[in-house]
Amino acid sequence: MDFSGSFFVIFVTFFFLPPLSSAGSYDSGSGLESLARGMLHSAKDPEFFEWMRGIRRKIHENPETGFQEFKTSQLVRDELDSLGVKYKYPVAKTGVVAWIGSCSKPVFGLRADMDALPLQELVEWESKSKVDGKMHACGHDTHVAMLLGAAKLLQTTKHLIKGTVKLVFQPGEEGYAGAYEMLKDEILDDLDGILSVHVFPSIPSGGIGSRPGTVLAGAGLFTVTVHGQGSHAATPHFSKDPVLAASSAVVALQQIVSRELDPLEAGVVTVGYIEGGHAQNVIPQSAKFGGTFRSLSNDGLLFIQRRIKEISEAQASVYRCKAEVNFEEKKPSLHPVMNNDEGLYEHGKKVAEAMIGKNNFHDFPVTMGGEDFSFFTQKTKAAIFVLGVKNETLGAGKPLHSPYFFVDEEALPVGAALHAAMAVSYLDEHGHSHEEEVKSEL
C-alpha cells in the first residue's frame, strides 16, 4: 500500500487541543479527529521524535531478557521522573506501573513489554545490540519508547484526563508469563480496560491493524521425558529403547490435529526438539522431546493438553518405557486465547481512523501466535492493536524473532499518539458514564 500523503498535515499545535465540553465529545467526528491528529502532530515534532528514537536505541543496544530488565526499568523510571510522573516499582521484580490523572475511576491501562530475546543480532547498523546473544527481535524496545512517548503526551494534557491512565511497563513476556505475574499486584485491580500495541513487520510503516474477537491463539509448552533401559546397540533385546518410544510418540502426537480436532477448528502441535544419547552404538537410558501446542479456543487448548499426556504415556508403554509429561506447572502452563473486547476494538478503530485515515487501518488476520497480554483479558476489557513498521527501503519487513528483524522508527509517533488518544477519548466517554452511576447510587 502506498502511504505517500496518507498522514494529514496538522496546523493546530498540541497545546491548543480543545477542552472537553460535553459527554462523548471525543466519541466521533471533529472532536476525535482534533484529539487524535493533534496528538500525532505533537509526537511528530522533531525534538519529540528524536527523544523517543533515542530511548528506543538505548534499549536496543542494551537488551535484557525476561525478569532481568534492570537497566531498561531504570531508564523507564528516569524518564518518568523527568516527566514528573508517579509510579510504583518494583512490580513483578522489574516491572513499573505509572499513573497520570485524577487517581480516581475510571482507570484505563496502556501496556508495553520490555524484554529481549536470546538471539544474536545480524543486522549491521549504528545501534546494533552490544550484548552478545541478546537482541530486541520482537520490538519491545519500540513498545517502551512509544509508551514513554504517550506518557509525555498525557502529562502535557492531563487536564483532559477524566479519570486515571495507568502505564504498565511489563517484564518477561517472552515465555515467562510476566503479565500473569504483574496482575498479582493490587495496583492493577482497578483497571476498567487496557490497550497493548505491538509492532508488526508485514503492515506498511505507520499503518494500524486489529480485529474484534479472537485474534491470537491460546498456547502452552510441554516436555516429555521417556525413561527406558539402556544397552549396547548390538543387543537391543536387552534394552527398553526410549529413542524408539519417543520417536513413536512424536509421530502419534501429530494425529491430534489431523484426526481428533474438528477440521474447522484451528490447532497446532509442534515438537521443537528431541534429544537422546550421545553415542552411535549405545541405546540410552532416556530420551526427551518438547514443543508447543496452540488453539483458538480455551476448551480446545485443554483438550490438546490432555491428549498430549495420554498419547505420550501410551506410546511409551507400547515400548515398555514410561513417559513423564511436564507442562511447566510452576508457572501458568497455559496462555489463554487473546480475545479483543469488541467495544474496545471499535473505539480503538475509530481513534486510529481519525488519526491516520480509514485507508491505513488494516483488518488483522487471526494468527496462531501467542501473547501473554491475554492474561489481562481475564481481569478486564482488553484489546491488542498492531502497528506497521514495514519499510523495504530500510530492510524493515523481516519476521518477528528473526535475527534480521528491523524497525522503521518513523512509526514511533503513530504508536505514541495512538496510546494517548485512545486513553483520553476512552476515559472521556466512560468517565461521564461513571459519574452518572455514582450519582444514581447516591
From Swiss-Prot:
Mn(2+) 2 binds at residues 138, 140, 198. GO terms for molecular function: IAA-Leu conjugate hydrolase activity; IAA-Phe conjugate hydrolase activity; metal ion binding. Its EC number is 3.5.1.-. One of its GO terms (cellular component) is endoplasmic reticulum. Keywords: Cobalt, Hydrolase, Manganese, Metal-binding, Signal. GO terms for biological process: auxin metabolic process. Expressed in leaves, stems, siliques, seeds and flowers. Detected in central regions of cotyledons, hypocotyl, radicle of mature embryos and seedlings, micropyle of siliques and in pollen. Mn(2+) 1 binds at residues 138, 174, 401. Hydrolyzes certain amino acid conjugates of the plant growth regulator indole-3-acetic acid (IAA), including IAA-Phe, IAA-Leu and IAA-Tyr. Can also use IAA-Ala, IAA-Gly, IAA-Met and IAA-Glu as substrates with low efficiency. No activity with IAA-Ile, IAA-1-O-beta-D-glucose or IAA-myo-inositol. Is the most efficient enzyme of the ILL family for IAA-Leu hydrolysis. Important for IAA-Leu and IAA-Phe hydrolysis in roots. May act with ILL2 to provide free IAA to germinating seedlings. PANTHER family: IAA-AMINO ACID HYDROLASE ILR1 (PTHR11014:SF108), PEPTIDASE M20 FAMILY MEMBER (PTHR11014). This is IAA-amino acid hydrolase ILR1. It comes from Arabidopsis thaliana. The lineage of its organism: Eukaryota, Viridiplantae, Streptophyta, Embryophyta, Tracheophyta.
